[in-house]
UniProtKB/Swiss-Prot annotation:
Its EC number is 2.1.1.186. GO terms for molecular function: S-adenosylmethionine-dependent methyltransferase activity. Catalyzes the 2'-O-methylation at nucleotide C2498 in 23S rRNA. This is Ribosomal RNA large subunit methyltransferase M. InterPro entries: RlmM_FDX, RlmM_THUMP-like, RNA_MeTrfase_FtsJ_dom, rRNA_MeTrfase_M, SAM-dependent_MTases_sf. Keywords: Cytoplasm, Methyltransferase, rRNA processing, S-adenosyl-L-methionine, Transferase. GO terms for biological process: methylation; rRNA processing.
Length: 361
């Protein structure tokens, strides 16, 4: 297929477009971007007929900051007849064979979500016809490709596929997390989503486990500390402001009424460092770099608040500088990931894992 369809947050189409333009060029897949403000999606139109196939295979979704989900896509199917929308879609998917799942989706906008009820109903007959054509297996198979049909408006859809090992497990790339009734703030969901994004399920018992020591810089009132406590960690919560009383009653939290930028940990066996401070992103990055150079943590999750303009450029500059500084200070083995999470707004979440090949005692 010729195109790559990418879901993103409404208002971040320019950032998603700039990123896919750069990343596709790195893979020598030429093309141009189609994007409109607040559509919540971007289409990268490749010059080569199989450009979308190449990108969906070679470009890891997890390496993209602003895309929630992506799939190799056909040209836009416009003016689908009300009397038979199924046949043109089945025909457009003729080159897809034995897919394991069907997702009929919309972009994440209020206008597009008005089609949600239609999409749910339409899935049933479409699934039956795709099974008859051989594009879809009779039984769901999580190891096979996923068929995507994304309605961007009434009678208008992009169709295509993604690979299950390079795709979000969620419809539209949106995780459905529930806000706990006793969580101190909604920001709690950001760290919950970040753990799911950056730490594979099969590794969470080792890397996100009870008994670990953690530090939360800028902790007040305790939204991120809550997620650490919920996972059984012992937390040093650093903030001049007050902490949630119920969190303090757990006995797992020690509150340091200090400036997060000046705090130095008493413990030297800290595994997790987390930080969600409203501060210039470069300053937060410098703080994390200092902690890494001092060897004060193994893994960190932190948020970078985004400027109003040149957001992709700013994030990339900070991440590139961080990589250079770590290497200059003898930290040559690390994993650095960044994602504009669903629960993020004008910010991105970054994960830094120092020397992942070395065990933590």
């Amino acid at each position: 297929m010729k195109n790559l369809f990418l879901f993103c947050r409404a208002g971040y189409e320019k950032e998603c477009a700039a990123e896919i333009q750069q990343r596709a060029a790195e893979l020598n897949v030429g093309g141009f971007v189609k994007a409109n403000n607040n559509d919540a999606y971007v289409v990268y139109q490749c010059f080569e007929e199989d450009g979308g196939d190449t990108l969906v295979k070679q470009l890891p979704l997890d390496s993209l900051i602003f895309a929630r989900q992506m799939f190799a896509a056909s040209e836009l199917l416009a003016d689908l007849p009300e009397s038979d929308r199924v046949s043109p879609i089945v025909a457009a998917l003729s080159e897809v064979s034995k897919a394991g799942e069907l997702r009929v989706e919309t972009p994440d906008t209020n206008e597009a979500k008005e089609l949600s009820a239609f999409c749910r109903k339409f899935t049933v007959p479409l699934r039956q016809h795709l099974k008859k054509s051989g594009s879809l297996l009779a039984q769901e198979n999580p190891k096979r490709p996923i068929i995507h049909v994304c309605f961007i408006g009434p009678g208008r859809a992009y169709v295509g596929y993604s690979f299950s090992n390079n795709s979000s497990p969620y419809f539209m790339g949106i995780p459905r997390l529930k806000m706990a009734a006793d969580a101190p703030s909604r920001s709690s969901l950001k760290l919950d989503e970040a753990f799911a994004q950056f730490v594979p399920k099969e590794e969470q018992e080792v890397r996100v486990r009870s008994g670990m020591n953690a530090v939360d810089l800028g902790a007040c009132p305790g939204g991120w500390t809550y997620q650490l406590v919920r996972r059984g960690m012992m937390v040093s919560a650093v903030d001049n402001g007050p902490m949630n009383e119920k969190l303090m009653e757990t006995g797992q939290v020690k509150h340091f009424r200090e400036d997060g930028f000046r705090f130095e940990p008493q413990r030297k066996n800290i595994y997790w460092l987390v930080c969600d401070m409203v501060e210039k992103p470069a300053r937060v990055a410098e703080l994390i770099e200092a902690w890494a150079i001092n060897g004060w943590f193994k893994e960190a999750i932190f948020n970078l608040k985004l400027p109003m303009k040149s957001r992709y450029k700013e994030v990339m500059a900070i991440l590139n500088t961080m990589q250079e500084i770590l290497k200059e200070n003898g930290i040559n083995e690390f994993q650095l990931q960044c994602k504009h999470l669903y629960h993020d707004r004008d910010e991105v979440t970054v994960h830094l894992w120092i020397r992942p090949s070395q065990a933590w005692n």
